[in-house]
Amino acid sequence: VFGKSVKAMKFDIPTLVWKDKSGKVVTHPMCPDIDDTYEFRPQYLIKFLTAHLFGQNLWMHGHTGTGKTTFGEQVASRIGYPVWRMNLDSNMERSDIVGSKEIVIENGQPTTKFFEGILPKAMQMPCFLILDEMDAGMPDILFSVQRALEKKGLVLTEDGGRLIQSHPAFRFIATANSRGQGDEFGWYQGVRPMNLATLDRFGTFIEVGYLSKDQESKVIAKSFPQMAKDRIEQVVQFTKEIREAFQGGELSTTISPRGSHALCQYFLHMKDLMPDENQAMKSAVEAVITDRAPMDSKQRVVEIAQRCFQ
């Protein structure tokens, strides 16, 4: 203000530096790549980093396509944290999470050996374990991780009751479409109300919304500097109206930042192949949005596209 800068929200956060056997600083193979075009939203970042500093489990919820998982991955990429991901859908089984016994051949003889699942492997190292679709997990699966959420370790009953203790720098991040109280909108099939004891094990909750027009414009401009400013504005307006129609119950499909990126990429490719730039954009919208929209949403998508790209 008045030409002066004010230092605010400055605090140290845990970061990791990895070195190979020779002592050279390297990037951990499970650490996500940095996306230089990514736009962090400060209101979410301060909550995320504070939870990380305190060692809390973090719950991030919001509509599909708001970038919940990507947010965690991009934080991890900048602080050197490896990332494990588990999608807690109906196909996930307890053996996938905690591990299972298998028969192997050792010294020519068959023997039973226990192989750790994703959870015990991740718990023993400094990393983020992202539990995608946490509110769609089956009850028996959620109970498998509940003790680990308490920071009391994980008992592997399948391996003689062996206790796995969490690494001090291990963190849980849950992503969900709900606050854990069930589907408030009636749009997300499979979302279940969560056990209150499970929810209580998450210290910080962040409701993630869609990018603002300015934020999305910056991302697209960084990713596609060859794209005309007026075209970027059209794409951003289109995605905004699609999302608003989705949130208002007019559409059963939406578009994520990844989708808007695909739209621009497809448009620029087709623009070089077609004499009519508007036809190239129409082709891009069809390929990325319209052709995957349910029949009850197609006409509404077409109407929005015609208005935004006329």
Language-model region placement:
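Alpha-helical lid/collar subdomain of P-loop NTPases
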Residues: 1-38, 42-45, 210-217, 221-310
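AAA+ P-loop NTPase catalytic core and its hallmark functional loops
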Residues: 1-230
